[in-house]
């Protein structure tokens, strides 16, 4: 007889219970054991944790725009209206160098250039006129940046002095290039076409648009824009300067080549000043970011002088011109305090002899490295005394 406490079960139920895994499951000593996860669920759980951890790290590492108050060059300076006492002596010396190098367009003799111009091949005239058109427009773009952005952002008096003088020199450069176009090009329609190069020439427009984008970029830091305009004056101009020095090597266009010496020296100084301002920054762009800006400018300049306006028109080697632009970019990277990108040698031996200070011009009475008398001397050097030994 069955006990009243025993569960009633059919034979089928007993057989099913006998086959079930639950019958073999032992719960002895398992009271505090946590439930186990399948391997798939374990992997999924780990992956989820890793994703959330990575996203949290990315958020914490997200680049934040440095505060203006953290940059001595940019923070509010109530003493910016007075020059003395000098606080940044290295910046002040750059300003005095620029001041000592002042020149005007009227000092360049173009009388011999007309005869040379008429003797040039059509391809050579085409190349020179288009390079001059680019130069005439680009100096205005550099000034736009100085007036609209840099001069208003930088609060250090010494730097403001330099920027003010740079604006004056860029105006003289633009006047010089416009004067060259006006002297060489007699056809009024062609002159108008060249003076409006930003709108009429796609190759010039591409370079101009790149620079103008940096002027209008409200998100880019001052440091990024300093690098960009160092690239404009150091890389965008480099190939065109070299092409005109190539004409000098051939003994052509004395007025053009002498003005090119003066302007290339000025632009070299402007580029050096940009690097100096970069070094004074507390929060600099990363090397990767600087590399990105420089390589973009190199690509655009290489395309300009090897495809859009190939230097082969004046007898230069396009491959070597590409290498020269890379060489200039490497030099700029070093000046900014970073490693070289391309690691190439200077392929143009004639450019080795052209320093930023300039060399005596064979055709000119004046020399390209001249400076205004007394500008770089100390006040004690010009004092009058009676203590000389006779």
Swiss-Prot record:
Subunit note: Heterodimer of a large and a small subunit. Interacts (via Cy motif and when phosphorylated at Thr-33) with CCNF; the interaction occurs exclusively in G2 and early M.
Record key words, sorted: Cytoplasm, Deoxyribonucleotide synthesis, Iron, Metal-binding, Nucleus, Oxidoreductase, Phosphoprotein, Ubl conjugation
Binding site for Fe cation 2: 170, 233, 267, 270
One cellular component term from this protein's GO annotations in UniProt: nuclear envelope
InterPro entries membership: Ferritin-like_SF (IPR009078), RNR-like (IPR012348), RNR_small (IPR033909), RNR_small_AS (IPR030475), RNR_small_fam (IPR000358)
Protein name: Ribonucleoside-diphosphate reductase subunit M2
Family to which this protein belongs: Belongs to the ribonucleoside diphosphate reductase small chain family.
Gene3D superfamilies per the UniProt record, alphabetical: Ribonucleotide Reductase, subunit A
Motif position, Cy: 49-51
Location of Phosphothreonine modifications: 33
Superkingdom of the source species: Eukaryota
